[in-house]
């Protein structure tokens, strides 16, 4: 078989079962692709020896008598936000320089237990704060796609930009991501792959470096919807180490992919029609609506009245939680510690370490969070944002109670933009990238981004489906129907 790294998880799994290839061969193909893709800066820590060791173990397991798990022998990348035992886990921040955890995150452990092969750690925005992968201490990851005849480097999105770039460029068969306000779905849309953020509590957060604890959720980033179903099943499950982890059975998501959505009710929220939205995004949304109607779904106009408050609500709650979570990084026990001048005490050590260790965007969000939690502003900002969050959640509950099965929206307000294009812009311009995705996190719902077309410059555009809580199987089936109808098969032309 040629170009093993271009296979989907499902194709590779079937090839392994039939004896047409081996996990070692798959892993070597991916490692070779990674070595040749330095220009993308997707992988920031490579683990070739560990990968080949796991691949050999997977091959032995596949030849054993017992049925091996679906993910057995499949090479994947792990976002740098996941703690991986003995492997650098920095959350793309200088403050965690040299940190090698003594433990493994629950999600990466479950994938390892299922036989998945970790190729290394993937680039991301620092502490998952960003929408362009430009806040990383490793430098930005680069989108494998290019505009028409233009050689300008584009963002792969963020914060899971390295994961997105690696999957789109066939450096790995799939990757883990995390999503706090759109960090799986926005990059997936920017590079033409599938990304699902499951219901809050479906995947354990234990061992994932925290950004905003009430919003963070891990999920898979894959080449298609079937792969997302396969990988999500391996990532899910109750974890007693995470108090927010749901004690629910994990269904066989792949078995639910029938593509039959006849009789399903799809909601189209009028509040997502924004001023200044590019015509191409509007047209794609309309096409997606017609595709689902043609597949037998009933299309219903719906209202989510508090949508306009979602972005400001998110950018109060997320920084507030981040300022609390990031207080633990002080240079005392691990990570970066600033060099001190004579006479400097503990306070100076904290101040200098944090000033050197945190990048500008992280510092901005910590300051915003500290401000909204301060005595004079707690009620005016933080408490008010929490109340609005509950109203946003109720909007969705009302719509689902009225019989809607899933909601179709654009995934992003534009295609991928150029690296550096927003450097001098108002930070709010960057935050607007999350305008269609943050509501899903605030309400704790599952959301999936599916590639559905190209813009006039040849860049991928995605559509988002939002589902009922805990019904990822149903949501993925609707996404599968959309994927089949859209027929998106475009790949980036190799320039790296």
Curated annotation (Swiss-Prot):
Q: What is its EC number?
A: 6.3.5.7
Query: Which catalytic residues are annotated?
Result: 79 (charge relay system), 159 (charge relay system), 183 (acyl-ester intermediate)
What keywords are assigned to this protein? ATP-binding, Ligase, Nucleotide-binding, Protein biosynthesis
Q: Which Pfam families match?
A: Amidase (PF01425)
Q: Gene3D superfamilies, per this entry?
A: Amidase signature (AS) domain
- Can you quote a single GO CC term? glutamyl-tRNA(Gln) amidotransferase complex
**One Gene Ontology biological process:** translation
Q: Does this UniProt record's set of keywords contain Nucleotide-binding?
A: yes
Query: A GO molecular function for this record?
Result: glutaminyl-tRNA synthase (glutamine-hydrolyzing) activity
Do you know which InterPro entries this protein is assigned to?
Amidase (IPR000120), Amidase_CS (IPR020556), Amidase_dom (IPR023631), AS_sf (IPR036928), GatA (IPR004412)
Superkingdom is Bacteria
Catalytic activity reported: L-glutamyl-tRNA(Gln) + L-glutamine + ATP + H2O = L-glutaminyl-tRNA(Gln) + L-glutamate + ADP + phosphate + H(+)
**Disulfide bridge map:** none
First-level EC class: ligase
PANTHER family cross-referenced by the UniProt entry:
GLUTAMYL-TRNA(GLN) AMIDOTRANSFERASE SUBUNIT A, TRANSAMIDASE
Q: Name the family.
A: Belongs to the amidase family. GatA subfamily.
Subunit structure, per the record? Heterotrimer of A, B and C subunits.
* Function text: Allows the formation of correctly charged Gln-tRNA(Gln) through the transamidation of misacylated Glu-tRNA(Gln) in organisms which lack glutaminyl-tRNA synthetase. The reaction takes place in the presence of glutamine and ATP through an activated gamma-phospho-Glu-tRNA(Gln).
**Protein name per the record:** Glutamyl-tRNA(Gln) amidotransferase subunit A
> Which organism's genome codes for this protein?
Ruegeria pomeroyi (strain ATCC 700808 / DSM 15171 / DSS-3)
